[in-house]
Swiss-Prot record:
SUPFAM superfamilies assigned to the protein according to its UniProt record, in alphabetical order: Nucleotide-diphospho-sugar transferases
Residues carrying the site annotation Positions MEP for the nucleophilic attack: 150, 206
GO biological process terms on file: isopentenyl diphosphate biosynthetic process, methylerythritol 4-phosphate pathway
One Gene Ontology MF term: 2-C-methyl-D-erythritol 4-phosphate cytidylyltransferase activity
Record site: Transition state stabilizer: 17, 24
The name this protein goes by in its record: 2-C-methyl-D-erythritol 4-phosphate cytidylyltransferase
Organism: Actinobacillus pleuropneumoniae serotype 7 (strain AP76)
Annotated pathway: Isoprenoid biosynthesis; isopentenyl diphosphate biosynthesis via DXP pathway; isopentenyl diphosphate from 1-deoxy-D-xylulose 5-phosphate: step 2/6
Entry keywords, A to Z: Isoprene biosynthesis, Nucleotidyltransferase, Transferase
Catalytic activity: 2-C-methyl-D-erythritol 4-phosphate + CTP + H(+) = 4-CDP-2-C-methyl-D-erythritol + diphosphate
Amino acid sequence: MTRKIIAVIPASGVGSRMQAGLPKQYLKLQNKTILEHTLEIFLAHPDIEKIVVAVAETDPFYPQVALLDSPKIQIVFGGETRAHSVFNALQVIEDDSWVLVHDAARPCLKRSDLDKLLQSDAKHGAILATPAIDTMKRADGDKIMHTEDRSTLWHALTPQFFPTHLLKQALISAFEKNLTVTDEASAMEFSGYQPRLIAGRSDNLKITRPEDLALAEFYLTQNTEK
């Protein structure tokens, strides 16, 4: 059965750790904003019917992004957290669809990783992730408590891919219980689901700090595959 697939891009964050004068999704790499690089990945994919972008209601920058005028893109206003922004986006998406949630500040996603995720047959959804390679320490303040077994640890990436109606229900349940939702998979986990891990590429980085910009620009320069 063919699935109806909608992408959601939460883009209402302020990116305070970037120490920049504007939200990080509007910083430029190769003469395009980070948001434009991200949107182009999904606009180019034939299986994605629509993209819903959640922006801050007071955001003065998004009207200047010409790509947001695409007929495939719908703008909604975000909420107080990333999870609330995603939930607001889900309100304009049909329950019988599947939703693909991706960070606005991950412009280096490869088409091959996106295809691999979309081909997953996990009925409760799946996420891109990378196995932990570094030694992982459990801390108490700035002191090491012990070393974690990294063999079962993964770094969660995006996109994250779920049946829309299940993700809506999971977010509502998490909000009602005042749980901290750091990504969509965590909301699904709180509701008892076990989304599948799909091994992705480590160059699908999230631009968070100033030093990430040069690395992202390098990856984009090398990335001839969308």
